[in-house]
């Protein structure tokens, strides 16, 4: 399916939740229970609570994840084998899901299923910036603090230390602002998503890329057991506040 001719003015919004079955670090990661809810269900509920997302679908290669998604009331599109291995790209899986859904939406919101903690308005902020600026894509970023590269060093096999950057001491307020993608949300124009170019893995972001800022810790991307523990604590605390 190709992008509609009016892709820049078509502001209908489709969210694609990505959830692979395989995970080397945490087996069944996207289906694991966290704060009483399957991991991927947190993202589905986040998307369904958005004021601007009109439809939510899930792309997966796992039957367990598919069952969870359907129990949350969303459509599921099973990935073919070639889009389910470690070398498959996120954008290729999203294109497959968009095509399979037959959605005419001009804006696609990409959400990772292993991110159970996000600010409630994050997707709406990204969509608003995309629409207001006419950009090709908007991604969420946090400002790098203690892991700023100007404070980093190299450590070789003998234990010898060399500074990564310029050999000087930086105070925190002297560090140039740098930002890291946090995995919270990507909003992209359909035309950009389907503009594929071999050898350019970031081509689908388009030429006009924008960002929205989050605070470090606002978004929790689950890769390890420690990430799970942090996210669980945050989600339980939120539940207690609203109880």
Predicted region positions:
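Catalytic donor-sugar/metal-binding loop of nucleotide-sugar-dependent glycosyltransferases
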Residues: 199-220, 225-229, 233-238
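Short, high-confidence coil segments that cap the C-terminus of an alpha-helix
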Residues: 53, 103-105, 134-135
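Short active-site oxyanion
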Residues: 52-57, 217-219
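N-terminal nucleotide-binding beta1-loop-alpha1 segment
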Residues: 1-27
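Short phosphate-binding loop-to-helix
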Residues: 63-109, 117-125
């Amino acid at each position: 399916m190709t992008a509609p001719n009016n892709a820049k003015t078509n502001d209908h919004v489709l969210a694609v939740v990505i959830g692979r079955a395989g995970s080397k670090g945490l087996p069944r990661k996207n289906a694991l229970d966290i704060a009483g809810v399957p991991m991927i269900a947190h993202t589905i509920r986040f998307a369904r609570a958005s004021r601007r997302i009109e439809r939510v679908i899930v792309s997966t290669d796992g039957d367990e994840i598919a069952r969870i998604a359907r129990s949350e009331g969303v459509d599921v599109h099973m990935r073919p084998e070639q889009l389910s291995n470690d070398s498959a790209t996120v954008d290729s899986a999203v294109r497959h899901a968009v095509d399979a859904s037959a959605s005419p939406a001009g804006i696609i919101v990409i959400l990772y299923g292993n991110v159970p903690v996000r600010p409630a308005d994050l997707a709406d902020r990204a969509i608003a910036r995309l629409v207001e600026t006419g950009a090709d894509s908007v991604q969420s970023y946090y400002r790098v603090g203690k892991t700023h590269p100007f404070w980093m060093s190299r450590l070789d096999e003998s234990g010898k230390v060399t500074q990564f950057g310029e050999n000087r001491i930086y105070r925190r307020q002297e560090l140039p602002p740098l930002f890291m993608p946090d995995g919270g949300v990507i909003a992209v124009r359909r035309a950009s998503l389907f503009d594929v170019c071999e050898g350019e893995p970031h081509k689908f972001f388009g030429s006009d890329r924008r960002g929205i800022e989050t605070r470090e810790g606002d978004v929790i991307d689950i890769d390890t057991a420690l990430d799970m523990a942090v996210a669980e604590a945050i989600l339980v605390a939120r539940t207690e506040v609203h109880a």
